[in-house]
Amino acid sequence: MSIQVFCDFDGTITNNDNIMSIMEKFAPPEAEEVKNRILSQELSIQEGVSQLFRLIPTHLHDEIIQFLIETAELRNGFHEFIQFVNENNISFYVISGGMDFFVYPLLQGLIPKEQIYCNETDFSNEYITVNWPHPCDHHCQNHCGLCKSSLIRKLSDTNDFHIVIGDSITDLQAAKQADKVFARDFLITKCAENYIAYTPFETFHDIQNELKHLLEVKS
């Protein structure tokens, strides 16, 4: 049995949700209603996020990237946490509903690209189009967009110990099949509603300390 860590990006690895930051800065007011319909689960994540990005003109590409480079911050302890999982041969994957044009640059030099799973964007038309290269498998009918539970099934064995780290509704389906969940923000609410055991966290130091204990117990 091996330990597999599946970690969200927006609002988890980074302090802020980068998609929401983009919408607040660059989208028209109607983005707020779409966001609320996603959080209430009235819209599927795939449809809601597609609608959000269709509100953003593609000519803002360079401006958006520059904005995120200047404002996005990695959560406290993340660098040390990555060093810890590497030293202990723990498999680590980023499974993100975020977009390639900002996830890859913000993680460059920290996480190999082959360990990052995110959505793809097309800037060839007037407005941004989101492509979905990691859809739901036949076990999931939630129209996740990037289906985290499907990726967990694809990347690991059922005998592995699955750890999910996340912060929002987009992490709920993955949390349902995890052996251990580290949660913050809205994911705490959803875990409580669905009777999913979780450990709250604010920094990656919190998670690293818990993992140290887990390794001691399993050794």
Curated annotation (Swiss-Prot):
GO molecular function: 2-hydroxy-3-keto-5-methylthiopentenyl-1-phosphate phosphatase activity
Species whose genome carries this gene: Bacillus cereus (strain G9842)
Official protein name in the record: 2-hydroxy-3-keto-5-methylthiopentenyl-1-phosphate phosphatase
EC number: 3.1.3.87
Function: Dephosphorylates 2-hydroxy-3-keto-5-methylthiopentenyl-1-phosphate (HK-MTPenyl-1-P) yielding 1,2-dihydroxy-3-keto-5-methylthiopentene (DHK-MTPene).
SUPFAM superfamilies named in the record: HAD-like (SSF56784)
Cleavable signal peptide: none
Catalysed reactions listed for this entry: 2-hydroxy-5-methylsulfanyl-3-oxopent-1-enyl phosphate + H2O = 1,2-dihydroxy-5-(methylsulfanyl)pent-1-en-3-one + phosphate
Pathway named in the protein's UniProt entry: Amino-acid biosynthesis; L-methionine biosynthesis via salvage pathway; L-methionine from S-methyl-5-thio-alpha-D-ribose 1-phosphate: step 4/6
InterPro entries hit by this protein: HAD-like_hydrolase_phosphatase, HAD-like_sf, HAD-SF_hydro_IB_MtnX, HAD_hydro_PyrdxlP_Pase-like, HAD_sf
Family of this protein: Belongs to the HAD-like hydrolase superfamily. MtnX family.
A Pfam family assignment: HAD
UniProtKB keywords: Amino-acid biosynthesis, Hydrolase, Methionine biosynthesis
One example of a Gene Ontology biological process annotation: L-methionine salvage from methylthioadenosine
HAMAP family for this protein: Salvage_MtnX
